[in-house]
């Protein structure tokens, strides 16, 4: 059994459902300390975070390449729907099954072993290696990576490159990497009316009827045209609720929850202003609360994306695609202190599902890609 596969199985065997790390990071610390990494643990509201650094011979003047990942996993769902116990690593048909196999314990194991091999081959490496690991990525993400980033910001520390081990591959290992992510902003809208008997609409004010024209305009609005890296911004309704459940009562208010996924072609302030303008145009009496979950970030083509593309091509023969599709990731926090953030990891078809798995044949190539990037950028 390869060292990468063995470490992946050790991590899967720990039921680290958010925010419980189940001592996964302790296992990583033991491996990294043996390589000469200095580490610190940052805990916040039950979340465990790890920042570990091994300086190169150039010290703080050299480039720093970080790996960012999460030891936490999503809940298993109904156990009876799994064909094997989710926290007992199981081999079947050339695949390794277990919660977190693809998202993202194989990636973490891969970068740890890649670092071990790199340090052994390049003991006088010029640049520095770092790990930023959290147990709060799959949950609220309020006490995880963001807390480490804030601590690093406070003392003036930065990264030059960061690889986030998210499972980005689609059909073949390495066919897609993420060089950015869209921002996410949600709104909770309450349109006020006047409750009344449905037989006497002149004595009431139906908020659903008042809302409908504005809602149609919001749905039809083209918010931007996107750009070279991002598709156009989208606006989607997630929930609509009004009424008491009775068939003879006009509701007193209508509630709508919606979400923007927006690119660098738009701003939070600009999108909010346009929504308010449409609602005001329709003379609605309303309350609107906004929640910004993350701002968009983008890494243009550069040293990290080029090194990763070359490593993937040399290891797998695959020509990778830069993409910004999908949901948010912790890359949005890391981009505050790192100019080049790229996500790369295994196939994502089974993540968050029952019978999550990774192809065993992909585990060593994944590790080798990470090692090749280390060799290109900081040897």
From Swiss-Prot:
The active site is at 72, 137 (proton acceptor). Keywords: Amino-acid biosynthesis, Cobalt, Diaminopimelate biosynthesis, Hydrolase, Lysine biosynthesis, Metal-binding, Zinc. Binds 2 Zn(2+) or Co(2+) ions per subunit. Its cofactor is Zn(2+); Co(2+). It holds the Pfam family M20_dimer. Pathway: Amino-acid biosynthesis; L-lysine biosynthesis via DAP pathway; LL-2,6-diaminopimelate from (S)-tetrahydrodipicolinate (succinylase route): step 3/3. InterPro entries: ArgE/DapE_CS, Bact_exopeptidase_dim_dom, DapE_proteobac, Peptidase_M20, Peptidase_M20_dimer, Peptidase_M20A. Zn(2+) 2 binds at residues 103, 138, 352. Homodimer. This is Succinyl-diaminopimelate desuccinylase. The lineage of its organism: Bacteria, Pseudomonadati, Pseudomonadota, Betaproteobacteria, Burkholderiales. The gene is dapE.
């Amino acid at each position: 059994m390869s060292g990468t596969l063995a470490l992946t199985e050790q991590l899967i065997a720990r039921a680290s459902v958010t925010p419980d790390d189940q001592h996964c990071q302790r296992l990583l610390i033991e491996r990294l300390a043996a390589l000469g990494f200095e580490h610190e643990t940052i805990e916040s509201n039950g979340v465990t975070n790890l920042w570990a650094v091994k300086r190169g011979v150039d010290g703080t003047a050299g480039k720093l390449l970080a790996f960012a990942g999460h030891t936490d996993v999503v809940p298993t769902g109904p156990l009876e729907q799994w064909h094997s116990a989710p926290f007992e690593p199981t081999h079947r048909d050339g695949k390794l099954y277990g919660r977190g196999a693809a998202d993202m314990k194989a990636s973490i194991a891969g970068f740890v072993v890649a670092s071990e091999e790199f340090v052994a081959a390049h003991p006088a490496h010029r640049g520095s290696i770092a790990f930023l690991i959290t147990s709060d990525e799959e949950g609220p993400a309020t006490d995880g990576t963001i807390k480490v980033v804030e601590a690093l910001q406070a003392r003036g520390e930065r990264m030059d490159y960061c690889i986030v081990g998210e499972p980005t591959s689609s059909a073949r290992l390495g066919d897609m990497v993420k060089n950015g992510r869209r921002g996410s902003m949600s709104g909770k809208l309450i349109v006020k009316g006047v409750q009344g008997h449905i037989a006497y609409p002149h004595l009431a004010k139906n908020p659903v009827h008042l809302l409908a024209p504005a809602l149609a305009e919001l749905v039809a609005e083209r918010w931007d045209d996107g750009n070279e890296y991002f598709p156009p911004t989208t606006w989607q309704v997630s929930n609509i609720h009004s009424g008491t459940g009775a068939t003879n009562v006009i509701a007193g208010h209508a509630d709508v929850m919606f979400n923007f996924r927006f690119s660098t072609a738009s701003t939070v302030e600009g999108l909010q202003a346009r929504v308010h303008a449409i609602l005001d145009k329709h003379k609605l009496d309303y309350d609107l609360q906004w929640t910004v979950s993350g701002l968009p970030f983008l890494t243009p083509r550069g040293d990290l994306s080029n090194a990763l593309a070359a490593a993937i091509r040399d290891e797998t023969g695959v020509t990778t695609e830069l993409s910004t599709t999908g949901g948010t990731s912790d890359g949005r926090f890391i981009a505050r202190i790192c100019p080049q953030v790229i996500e790369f990891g295994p196939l994502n078809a089974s993540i968050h599902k029952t019978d999550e798995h990774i192809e065993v044949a992909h585990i060593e190539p994944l590790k080798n890609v990470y090692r090749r990037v280390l060799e290109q950028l900081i040897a």
